[in-house]
């Protein structure tokens, strides 16, 4: 029976965050943080005590799980944000305060509406970045159905249409693609 890769063997969040440019003293948010804090907890370590990290999710149970893990690990620079990035103004983080936002395994949400991208624009600082990571289509897996996978070129097109430019497209792991965008300045 084949093994199912997990943790860093599937998606190394530390490597991806650093690739996106996350460094000491930055402010970062993960939109759709999920139950494990797979991106926010490594981000807390990368940005250090002078930085701020926001775990954003609409599911309170997911946020409670992340908060419990953060408390066990004595993380002090993590903010739990119950919010809806699919609604304009739905994320209660100060406008223009974030250096980097990530959307991990939520590309299907991005394809339904431009609101998440506009919400990211509202919250990003000038020259802010967005990291988008999702499942590659056409790679057989029992983890995620093929119908739930989104092509990276479709996401690329959406972000460009909303004032971002692509900095990098890359393989984010054995079953994931990654895109890094920068908010274009007028």
Regions of interest found by a model, annotated:
Residues 7-27, 38, 42:
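Conserved alpha-helix/loop element of class I SAM-dependent methyltransferases that forms part
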Residues 162-186:
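Core SAM-dependent methyltransferase catalytic element
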Residues 27-90:
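Class I SAM-dependent methyltransferase SAM/SAH-binding core
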Residues 98-113:
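A short SAM/SAH-binding and catalytic strip from SAM-dependent methyltransferases
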Residues 129-158:
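Conserved class I S-adenosyl-L-methionine
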Residues 19, 25, 50, 75-77, ...:
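A generic structural signal for alpha->beta connector loops
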Residues 23-26, 86-101:
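A short acidic, Gly/Pro-enriched loop at the edge of an enzyme's catalytic core
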Residues 44-48, 114-129:
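A short glycine-rich, Lys/Arg-flanked "PGG" loop and its adjoining helix->strand segment in the class I
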């Amino acid at each position: 029976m084949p093994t199912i890769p997990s943790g860093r063997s599937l998606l190394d969040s530390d490597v991806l965050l650093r690739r996106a440019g996350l460094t000491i003293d930055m402010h970062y948010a993960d939109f759709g943080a999920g139950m494990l804090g797979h991106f926010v907890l490594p981000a807390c370590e990368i940005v250090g005590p002078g930085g701020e990290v926001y775990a954003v999710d609409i599911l309170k149970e997911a946020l409670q799980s992340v908060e419990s893990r953060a408390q066990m690990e004595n993380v002090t620079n993590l903010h739990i944000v119950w919010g809806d990035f699919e609604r304009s103004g739905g994320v209660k983080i100060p406008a223009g305060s974030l250096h980097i936002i990530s959307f991990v395994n939520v590309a299907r949400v991005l394809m339904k509406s431009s609101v998440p991208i506009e919400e990211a624009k509202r919250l990003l600082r000038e020259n802010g970045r967005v990291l988008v990571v999702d499942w590659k289509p056409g790679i057989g897996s029992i983890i995620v159905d093929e119908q739930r996978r989104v092509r990276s070129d479709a996401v690329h097109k959406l972000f460009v249409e909303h004032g971002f430019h692509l900095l990098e497209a890359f393989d984010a792991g054995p079953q994931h693609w990654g895109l890094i965008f920068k908010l274009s300045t007028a």
